[in-house]
Amino acid sequence: MTEAIPKGSLGSPLLTFPPLEEGVLVKRYKRFLADVELVSGEIVTAHCANTGPMTGVLHPGGRVRLRHAPSPKRKLAWTWEQAEAPSSQGGLCWVGINTALANSLIRAAIEAGHLKQVLGPIAAIRPEVTYGSNRRSRIDLLLTPDANCSDTRPIYLEVKNTTWNEHSLALFPDTVTERGQKHLKELIGVLPESRAVLVPCLSRHDVQTFAPGDSADPRYGELFRLALTAGVEVIPCCFGFHRDKITWEGLRPTKTTQS
């Protein structure tokens, strides 16, 4: 279970948790499964909460970190949380690969006041609210601004876990994503009555800028630029991943194209 930490400077803990178990990735298969050899030599099967190819991050033989959470309600007692990958700054960088954690990270950053400058003061946060043209989509976070805010429109906020790094440029997506394309269209649809915000959750500390992954999904790149023109805001948030905590590493600027 993670614990939110009060706001602080860059590099300060945002979430803390019991130390993760380290091991070496043997293989990933069937998208949701990964075999890992622990330090003890035991080989365990972990749940992989990431359906993408994890470009530049998936390295059999590389170091990984797992969370041990046995429960009668879970088929697997282990969850793959982090992977060590080559860093654009030289050396290696720990990357957060659990996409299910991204929403909690962004919510914690908002509650800690890290996004107040760009979002304004927030009075309430509601997760997974139904919206869209056919009411079949769910927005990750629906924010209600403080009554004294200069812009009191509701804020529809979509989060995208981002792990792909090319020369310090964080890129999303790393594969064709019709779901991601749909989310951009839905964000455009709430304008101008509401604010629409895309938040790339940059789950590695070694990136300096965010851009759409045009080479992986050209259509997503086109829709991304259309969304910017329509008034969708993009707020990339960067985090550092450690064995027992996740740190706030600040906001990052956005490029409109990968090249």
Swiss-Prot record:
InterPro entries in alphabetical order: SfsA, SfsA_C, SfsA_N
GO molecular function term, any single one: DNA binding
Pfam families reported in the protein's UniProt record: SfsA, SfsA_N
Protein family membership: Belongs to the SfsA family.
Listed name of the protein: Sugar fermentation stimulation protein homolog
The species this protein was found in: Prochlorococcus marinus (strain MIT 9303)
Gene: sfsA
